[in-house]
Amino acid sequence: LTLGRVSNLPTVWSNCLAASAINLCAHGWVRAIPDWKDLNALDPLLLLPLLLGASLLYMGGCTLNDAFDQKFDAQYNPERPIPSGGISPARVWTLGSAELGLGAWMLIDLAQCEPLWIGALVLGIILYDALHKKWSGGVMLMGGCRLLLWAGAATCGVSETIYPLTWIWGATLAFYVVGISLFARGEAKAKEEAPKLSIVFLFGPALVALAALIHWNNLDPIRVFLVNLVGLLIAWIAFDAILQMRGGKKGAIGSGVSRLLAGICVTDALVVSFCMPMLIAPLLCLNPLALWIQKRFAAT
């Protein structure tokens, strides 16, 4: 469970649910207001393998991350499972590869996701694991993996088309994830200020939602209220986490990053506020679940 970083699984589930929902409700052009649909628009027979398959891909990627990083961890993170002797490298390689393979099969065969996006996601995961310690731009691969997960989940079932609105929100999510890493990296270095662009990325979901409300100025009052409510929540999470990390207290950066990661669930709740309001509460509940699991298993 430590290898698989299970504390972040609620964010994977929320990504899958939100991507499926927005793509079901979106149209071929951005000007069109997304449809309002109920939860019965989501097929539970497809959602179960979607969530399980995505979970296995995420855990497989995290497991292989330890396999790729074993030399680095032996020097800098001796408490990790491999250098501490908790598990052998061969077993980690086998376990991670099996999780990736099984997860990809479930997504393609059972959840009926588009093979192109799932294959690209698997490739992206492996590239990130192999390069992130060697290349400072690896953070872009991390965001790219979230975008590819979003794209794959959007094609769950009979849908092969990914609509422009789905891509916009997927890119917003990807930049939010990039913003977490960039800001934390800057704050962790005493002589280096966090890039200002990272702050824009962290507030990206709220800003995109505000732009959408202006764009769809005839959106019904219920959805306008819900978007404003959830948008203020994710903006507050970003603002509070930034202040916490800049406070300089011991463990503040790790705590702030964990809160921002759990905030992915709130970002997804903001997305469905436009199209499937009944899904808001379940996605918001995944946020405290992620925070609770983080107390038992590290999120990073």
Predicted regions located by residue number:
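Helix-loop junctions at the membrane-solvent interface of multi-pass transporters
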Residues: 21, 109-110, 130-131, 155-156, ...
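Multi-pass membrane catalytic core of lipid/isoprenoid biosynthesis enzymes
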Residues: 48-55, 70-125, 143, 149-151, ...
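C-terminal membrane-associated helical module and adjoining short loops/tails
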Residues: 1, 147, 153-300
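Acidic (Asp/Glu-rich) catalytic motifs at the cytosolic membrane interface
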Residues: 53-87, 91, 180-193, 293, ...
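N-terminal, positively charged, Ser/Thr/Ala/Gly-biased leader segments
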Residues: 1-17
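Short, amphipathic, aromatic/basic-enriched membrane-interface segments that mark the entry/exit
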Residues: 2-3, 66, 82-92, 109-113, ...
